[in-house]
Amino acid sequence: MSRIGKNPVPVPDKVTVSLDGLTVKVKGPKGELERTLPDGVSVSQDNNCIVVAPSTSKRFSRERHGLCRTLVANMIEGVNNGYSKSLEIVGVGSRAQVKGKTLVVSAGYSHPVEMEPPEGITFKVENNTKVIVSGIDKELVGNEAAKVRAIRPPEPYKGKGIKYEGERIMRKAGKSGKK
């Protein structure tokens, strides 16, 4: 049995959860999320807790047990507190700004790169070099942050590019040259 999956998910007072078969709807102060869980698990509500259990003892059911529990926990955390990911832009002349809702990144290309956020995601820029991606869906926040980083991933020689806050870049030595 999954060590993560067997723990019940506590539901805060400000959050309401409704179950319809394998569809879980979570509503909280930050918004509302809905997700259909894969087959092989059963979801039930006891008091102020959500319990996820494998519906059969087959392997695919046991594999999805911990995953589904974590997905439900992430939904509850997202509508209650939200998620955010910070990125740093390193390099001379590289900067970002928000125009309306669109993120505009100047990262050393001949043109600025524009990113339109999907529904539920907001971009915020501090000091022209720090981008904060925030929203209530953890998966969507992570995907959008990865797309921003992919505009100009950090290079190993000088460390220039877009990196996650706190990310350590493995540095390489340059050519030593002829003597």
Swiss-Prot record:
Pfam families: Ribosomal_L6. One of its GO terms (biological process) is cytoplasmic translation. Coiled coil: none annotated. GO terms for molecular function: rRNA binding; structural constituent of ribosome. GO terms for cellular component: cytosolic large ribosomal subunit. The keyword Ribosomal protein applies. Keywords: Ribonucleoprotein, Ribosomal protein, RNA-binding, rRNA-binding. InterPro entries: Ribosomal_uL6-like, Ribosomal_uL6-like_a/b-dom_sf, Ribosomal_uL6_a/b-dom, Ribosomal_uL6_bac-type, Ribosomal_uL6_CS. This protein binds to the 23S rRNA, and is important in its secondary structure. It is located near the subunit interface in the base of the L7/L12 stalk, and near the tRNA binding site of the peptidyltransferase center. Belongs to the universal ribosomal protein uL6 family. Part of the 50S ribosomal subunit. This is Large ribosomal subunit protein uL6. It comes from Parasynechococcus marenigrum (strain WH8102). The gene is rplF.
